[in-house]
Amino acid sequence: MKVILKENLENLGHIGDIVKVAPGYARNYLLPRGYATEATEKNAKALEHAKRQLEYKRNKVLEQAKGLAAKIEGLTIAITHQAGEEGKLFGAVTNMELAEHLKAQGVEIDRKKIVLAEPIKHVGEYTASVKVHPEVAAALKVVITKAD
């Protein structure tokens, strides 16, 4: 019996795959649990339509993410912090502080998406990576200066 998978199943295949299985396995396990539907012409057409819609939405989200990444790449965050004699900061600049500065410039990003190689503890120029989308990352320029 041929079925169209609705879920990723480890030993069978991925979503949308048409696989041949034993009739009992399909009738007693896959179909009742909603893991698959029977591979009829109608179901195959519905699957193709759903795939096209999903691909369209995915492309639209990806384009928005690329636009946001381009906006972030053009920004430079300037932060003034208390620092000691040799430029060592009292405390550290974290991704939470960077997220607040981005929000002030009109870009709202979750702090967990801002990745610093290590906490910023000295005056200088740094680059932070912002994961806008699983496939899109932007480099954010951060300039730390000493407060008077």
From Swiss-Prot:
GO terms for cellular component: ribonucleoprotein complex; ribosome. It comes from the Bacteria. Pfam families: Ribosomal_L9_C, Ribosomal_L9_N. GO terms for biological process: translation. Keywords: Ribonucleoprotein, Ribosomal protein, RNA-binding, rRNA-binding. Gene3D superfamilies: Ribosomal protein L9, C-terminal domain, Ribosomal protein L9, N-terminal domain. The keyword Transport does not apply. The keyword Ribosomal protein applies. GO terms for molecular function: rRNA binding; structural constituent of ribosome. Belongs to the bacterial ribosomal protein bL9 family. NCBIfam families: L9. Binds to the 23S rRNA. This is Large ribosomal subunit protein bL9. The lineage of its organism: Bacteria, Pseudomonadati, Thermodesulfobacteriota, Desulfuromonadia, Geobacterales.
